[in-house]
Amino acid sequence: MKSVITNAAEITVLEPIDNNYKTGGGPVSVGGCVVVATKGRPFVPHEIFGVGTSQEDTFGKPLPKKAYGMEGLRQLSEAAKECNWVQTVRVVNSTEYRYPSQAYLLFKERGDWAAGTLYMPGDVVTHGGQQFIAAAEHTAATPPAVGSGEWLAYTGPVEKDSHRYNEKVLVGDDGYWLVLYPIDGDASLKRTVRIEDVDTEKERFRLVLYDKDDTGYEYELESLLVGIGEDDKDDMGRPAYIETVFETQSTRFRCDFLEGTTWSELEPILLALEHKKATPQGVSFEGGTSGGEPEIDDWLKAVELLRRESLPLNMLFAAGISDPDVLARMTEIADYRHIAFFFDVPSYLSYRGAMDWLKNLGLKSRHARAYYAPFEASDPWRGGKTVWGVSGAMAAAKARGNAIFTKNVPGVHYSPAGEKRGYLSRTGVACLFPDETLNRDTLYTARLNPVIPMTSGGACADDDLTQHFLENYLRFGWINDTLDYIDQRFVEAARIAKFEPDGLTYEILYKLMKQILDELVTSGALVKPRDPEQDGNKEYIITITQVEIDLWHVEWAVCITGAARRIAGQPRLMK
């Protein structure tokens, strides 16, 4: 059936016209942060979910209490429990971090060295109680010796090396048939590799990777049955080629295989390396390290990944970062992306010290919120009491509000403060400075949100102010959250209308903006103006103007709901 009208005498059915565009519908509680961890591929966003063991599998346990960067994973854990997920980047010292590799030699045992014999690269001989491997094709005339150019000292069938985070590992053409390396950022110092179940008929073998826990117990990480033919299939019809198996079945390791290597070349090597009960063999990794403390450039490099608009993100939290330059960059990214940013004044500071610290920081942004939480709490990971900040907990509080749906509309206008949403999910909460009294007026002037004890136990955030110092509505967090939500959906609508002709452009923009704002009226995010004489009695007003032939200007005036920050009771005596 044709779908194009031509001069032919035929019946044509045209493609359907569908102008039923919509925006929204995606997750609205995706967090973002940067952490220090013992493992996890560095400088790459990882999606961390609050269910299962997603965080510990990716990054390991939170660091010891006195370790550099110990707050990060603790705060991430709190955020991930309530957020849809958290885009998390591991930062490392890029000059000192190393990941290990194992390079397997393509060798052939030739026994004792003999004069007049033709030797090929990879041939291994014994002479004078030492082993040598041929480095070049030659006919033996003089006994093997290191430095001759014909022989190298043979140290074993596997060579070990380590590499920088952005260094690629390739098998090359210098005598190796396989290079194996971790991709999960683990230093792999307790990991070993075994070759098992060499099948000479099907021309396959099994690579089994092991690790050890803190008690020294060895357990299996992965077991992969592989072949060396690019078209090889396993018994279930899945690709069995070694590189494909690692890419599709392994989350921790990758390999590079020397193309063109034949089974006849590998079989004696595999049989010599095969792990058996009678002859147990395992190859360990060496040289992997997390390096020292990350430098400021490393932090900025990691944080900058959160700027990418292709990365879904609705909020940022500092996760224990207190460096002014890094906080300033995260604030800049939040302003650029129109999303909230939660950060802590260091919890170990006294009230006066906290005020001075925030003043010296000097941030100014309608998206940044500062919190002061001088509390310790029970540490579920390391035991005892530990002090860590609340930026992750505030991301969780924001997610709790977003999860209050009215039909399909998230509760973006709910403030992440108070006992209902702004509480800390911690036990054994105790104040570090119980004798100090907070001056709430001074806190307001500094736009510093205090975390205070609750009468029912625990603690909660007791204000929702941004680092915006003008006396207008933009100083309130929930106002900006609602504006940002509208901004994000407007961008979706504008993308749909982009490059359409005038009439269709106006229709799409008006229809979609009206849909967005009507939904927010239904949810209670938008309310009738408090000054009807000045602003009228409609919750919103949309104005669309074509400024130039290729430029459209869309304005939405909205009245956003308030929040009961202040409640006054007036006693009155009667006769």
How should each PLM-predicted stretch be described?
Residues 1-109, 157-509, 516-536, 541, ...:
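A glycine- and small-residue-enriched flexible loop/hinge signal that marks low-structured segments
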Residues 126, 208-212, 559:
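A generic structural motif
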Residues 143, 216-218, 325, 563-567:
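Intrinsically disordered, low-complexity acidic/polar segments
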Residues 45, 124, 131, 566-568:
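Well-ordered beta-strand positions in beta-sheet-rich domains
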Residues 510-514, 573-575:
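Active/binding-pocket-proximal capping segment
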Residues 131-132, 205-207, 552:
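Hydrophobic residues embedded in beta-strands of well-ordered beta-sheets
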Residues 539-575:
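C-terminal edge-of-domain segments
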Residues 107-157:
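Tryptophan-rich substrate-binding surfaces of secreted polymer-degrading and adhesive proteins
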